[in-house]
Amino acid sequence: MMLWYIVAGAGGLLIGYLIANYQINQKLRKAKEDAQTIIEKAEKEANEIKKKAIIEGREEVHRLREEFEKERSRREEELRALEERLLKREELLTRKEENLEKREQQVEELKANLEEKMREVEEKEKRIDEELKRLAGMTVEEARELILEEARQRYEHDLAKLYKEMKEQVEEEAEKEAKKVIAFAVQRYAPDYVGEITVSTVSLPSDDMKGRIIGREGRNIRTFEKITGVDLIIDDTPEVVVLSCFNPLRREIARITLEKLVADGRIHPARIEEMYEKAKQEVEKAIKEAGQEATFKAGVMGLHPELVKLLGKLKYRTSYGQNVLNHSIEVALLAGYMASELGLNADKARRGGLLHDIGKAVDQELEGSHTTIGAELARRYGEKEDIINMILSHHGEEEPMTPEAVLVAAADALSAARPGARRESLENYIKRLMKLEEIAKSFKYVEKAYAIQAGREIRVIVEPDKVDDALAEKLAYDISKKIEEELEYPGVLKVVVIREKRSVAYAK
């Protein structure tokens, strides 16, 4: 039993030993595993710390590199700025050096000029001394005149140069402004224009009327031409006769006379004279109406009735083929437009423009230029001096006193210079016929003179009580000789002196 206890105790000890050993081995194995885990964890943490340290090191290197680059850029920028400042200072020093050299040069020049001035002063002092010695024997007035003459000679050249420069500048500016004003005026006024002709036609009811117009042995046509001073041309043109005359007024009166005769049907010398007087009255009325219409178109009010009538007469006057009344209206409107543009008196400019050729209404009846005659008429009918000056100055016979007078002259030139406004050849022809009549009228005892047949014949009507047959022949000869001396004309010119004595009695 004891052995069993011993064996059991030994077995228990062995089992305890085995169990303890097993537990120890388990603990050792667990400790090894824990140690391995700790080692692995430590290695892992060490790797992570290493990686983190590497990353942080790289970031630090990158940061340090960026800081270095920034610092390097800053330093480079500072160096560039320093270089620029140095360059600027160098340029400044260079300019200062150049300025200094210029100043030195100027000082040298001033020094030279000063020396020259000093020499001039010394010379002037010498001249003044000599002049004073000479002036000692002069009066105060003589000395004053001498000093003024020297001053004039000294500054005359400078004044002339300054005057020339200012004149050129003013003329240039004035030309620009004038072109602008003229263009504005021309744009505002663009009239229709129809050239004037020297013939009129009268329609007939039939060709039989031509024979009645001619009359027995041509007495009717001779009477008509003698009374009207117009050529009556009868040709093969059916149912038409032509009136030819350079004077539009005579031609218009003749046209109305002939139309009345044709309408009446009774054509003989006495009837011709009667119709001629009626036609004159109609034309007088038309002249007045034309004058009133002209003042309305031009915007001119308050003219004397006689001036209005004279304006109407301009309807039957031409200048180089241009109707004088239309020309006057055109000048008035152009002058008014330009005056408005320049801020001047447009009413005054229009008035002067409308009246500038008023003398042409009567210049065939009076001696003198149309401007002189026009000025006298304007003065007679109460126009102011500035308007009279516009009439006289538009052809340069008198200096313009107002800016409006200059505008009237400019408008006159504009109207005449318009393309197609005037015809030189027609005007020369008309002037030759007018001169022909003037030569004949210049002789004593001549009542009327008519140039007919396109200027190839002139008929002169004389006072029958004072001119006998012998004197009539002498008068025809004298007129022909004066025409030869004063006038150029093609071919042969016929001078016919008509002396007609009428005795009238009435049976009651």
Curated annotation (Swiss-Prot):
Domain HD, first and last residues per copy: 324-417
Alphabetical UniProt keywords: Cell membrane, Endonuclease, Hydrolase, Membrane, Nuclease, RNA-binding, Transmembrane, Transmembrane helix
The KH domain, residue ranges: 198-283
InterPro entries xref list: HD/PDEase_dom, HD_domain, HDIG_dom, KH_dom, KH_dom_type_1, KH_dom_type_1_sf, Ribonuclease_Y, RNase_Y_N
GO cellular component, one term: plasma membrane
Location relative to the cell: Cell membrane
GO molecular function ontology, one term from the record: RNA binding
Membrane-topology annotation of the record: Single-pass membrane protein
EC code: 3.1.-.-
Presence of keyword Membrane: yes
Alphabetical GO biological process terms: mRNA catabolic process
SS bond list: none
Top-rank EC class of the record's enzyme: hydrolase
UniProt KW Lipoprotein keyword: no
Bilayer-crossing regions: 1-21
Function: Endoribonuclease that initiates mRNA decay.
PANTHER family referenced in this protein's UniProt entry, alphabetically: RIBONUCLEASE Y
Record-stated family: Belongs to the RNase Y family.
Name of the protein this chain belongs to: Ribonuclease Y
Gene name linked to the record: rny
